[in-house]
Structure formats: C-alpha cells, structure tokens
Design a protein with these regions (language model features):
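Short helix-initiation/N-cap motifs at beta->coil->alpha
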Residues: 48-54, 126-140
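A local structural motif
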Residues: 40-46, 100, 117-129, 142, ...
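Short, solvent-exposed loop/beta-turn-alpha elements that line the ligand-binding surface or hinge
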Residues: 1-2, 46, 89-111, 158-160, ...
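Glycine-centered hinge/linker elements that transmit conformational signals in sensory
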Residues: 54-60, 98-127
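Hinge/lid segment of periplasmic solute-binding proteins
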Residues: 1-33, 54, 80-83, 166-167
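Extracytoplasmic/periplasmic substrate-recognition and gating elements
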Residues: 39-42, 114, 157-220
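Alpha-to-beta junction loops
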Residues: 63-66, 140-148, 163
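Conserved C-terminal helix/tail region of periplasmic/extracytoplasmic solute-binding proteins
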Residues: 37, 43, 215, 242-296
Length: 296
C-alpha cells in the first residue's frame, strides 16, 4: 500500500480481514504558493529541515503575513502535526516497545510534542477557530500554511478554486535525508465474509480497483492511488513524490493509540497552554488504564 508491498490487516472478533487500499492521504502542511513568491521563497522547493522550516515561518512573520493558520477549536486537527512530526522522530517499532512496557509516552513523544507546541507559537492570528473557519481563512490568503493533510485540499479548493496550492512534508530534524512522510490509507474496500453475493461483490471491487477508477477518485479528492506507479490526484502533491519513490513513509502515530483515549482533547489543551509535560503525563495515565484492562 502506498509504495509498500503489503496490505493493512484489520483483526475483528478473532477473524482476519484484508481490505484493498482504494485511496491514500498524507500528513504535512498545505501552503500558498503565491505568498511564498511574495516573500522571495521558492514554492517548488519547500524546506527540508526543521531549521529551514522555522526560518520560513519567521520570514512570513517579518513580512507581516500570518505564517500559520490553526483550527484548534476542532481538537482532531491538532493530531495532524503530531502525526507529521512523529513520522520522522519516532520509529514505528517504538510503539511495540510502549505496548510491551519497555518505554514510556514521555520518552516516545517528548520531542514531538515540544515541536508541535512551538509550531503554533508562530501564528500571528487566532488559532482557536474551527476547521471550517480555518480552511476558509487559508483559502482567502490570510495565512501562508495550514498544518493539515492532503484531505483538506478539496475543502480549500471548494472555497477558492483559483488558489495555487502546494503540499509538503513537515520536517522534524535538521537532517534532510532523515525526513519521513506520514501517509496511510484513506479509503479501503472490503467484502463481507458471509455475503450472499460474493461474485457480484468481487466484480464491483475489480471494477473500482481499475486504474481509471482509482485515478478518477484521486482527481476528485486530491488523493493518492495505492499502486506502485503512484498517481497523485493534485499537482500540489508532486513535492512529496520522492518520499513514495524512496519508500520513506510512516503510518499515522495516533493509529497506535486506542480510540478510547481522547488524544485530540489532550493535544488541544497542550497546544493552547504550551504545557507539554501535562499532556505526556495524561497520555501515560490513560495508556496505563487501557493496558490494565487489556488481556491478550
């Protein structure tokens, strides 16, 4: 899926299900190419290190342009930068260690959440607006970047079809070659194990998995196809093509966190307060509660 020779496996009630990946997305940030040019930045070559990234934000601030549009009123949007940064900073094997009790949330995410907390301090406008208002503000040219994934592109283009957008991986360290793009499945196809119409269902899946159908959906949703010859449904995504070609991809870190933990709510508080230690301690407490009632 998305450049890797495997399918995502979902275990339900002790039975295995193997969905086909139909469309994918990626996490990073969307940027306004016109504003890049206005301050003398090359929109075709976004920053590749954390220092370059923060320098870019300061360049916009110095020019009197809001560097970053937040949408923190909708807590789930704070999970996007966490996933973007953790893709580079936290190897996926560390989540197995967390589950085994061989590491802690503090050790796992300390640097990640500190960088996310810093990220929002670069905004010169109200970050506590909704996703709807935030994407509207961005579409109207009121900010240089919005730290959301590819899934937000259609919403922005719906508001302003003429805006020239770019999409980039959010660098998390000062080593350009170390950067990893957070990407994953957005839509998957399955067939019920006990369906009365297996042949008909398979025909539908086979139809939808044809390249023409995959590409058409990708075009409509600015999505990414799951084929080895990856197709990007929006030219804005071309800047992240090398990550797919070089298999520098990681899953969303919050996929490793049980849904019973309100990670978005805790992140929302962390971003607005800047108290990263409280967030890490809250997450550890909630993680321990889940593990205490989990039997395998």
């Amino acid at each position: 899926i998305l450049g890797r020779e495997k399918f995502m496996t979902i275990v339900t009630c002790g039975r295995l299900s193997f969905p086909f990946s139909f469309a994918g997305n990626a996490s990073g940030y969307i940027y306004n190419k016109a504003l890049f040019r206005k301050v003398g930045l090359d929109p075709e070559n976004p920053p590749t290190t954390w220092s370059e990234f923060t320098d870019m934000l300061n360049t916009f601030k110095d020019a009197g342009i809001n560097p970053l549009q937040g949408s923190v009123a909708d807590a789930w949007t704070t999970q996007a930068p966490l996933a973007s940064l953790a893709g580079t900073l936290v190897p996926e094997s560390k989540y197995t260690e967390l589950k085994q009790g061989n590491t802690t949330v503090q050790e796992l995410w300390k640097t990640t959440v500190e960088k996310e907390s810093e990220l929002f301090t670069y905004s010169t406008a109200d970050t506590g607006v909704t996703y709807q208002q935030g994407t509207q503000n961005f579409a109207q040219g009121k900010a240089a970047i919005i730290p959301l994934g590819t899934y937000a592109l259609p919403q922005i283009l719906l508001i302003n079809p003429d805006i020239e957008l770019g999409f980039a991986q959010m660098p998390a360290t000062d080593g350009a070659s170390e950067q990893i793009l957070t990407a994953g499945d957005d839509v998957m196809l399955t067939i019920g194990a006990n369906t009365k119409h297996p042949k008909e269902a398979m025909k539908l899946v086979e139809f939808l998995m044809q390249k023409d159908q995959l590409d058409a959906y990708a075009d409509a949703q600015s999505a990414i196809t799951p084929l080895k010859d990856t197709y990007f449904g929006n030219d804005a995504l071309e800047t992240v093509r090398p990550f797919f070609e070089e298999n520098r991809l990681a899953d969303f870190c919050d996929h490793y966190i049980p849904s019973s933990i309100n990670i978005g709510g805790y992140l929302q508080t962390m971003v607005t307060s800047g108290n990263t230690d409280r967030f890490l301690n809250q997450m550890q407490t909630e993680w321990d509660k889940v593990q205490a009632r989990t039997f395998e």
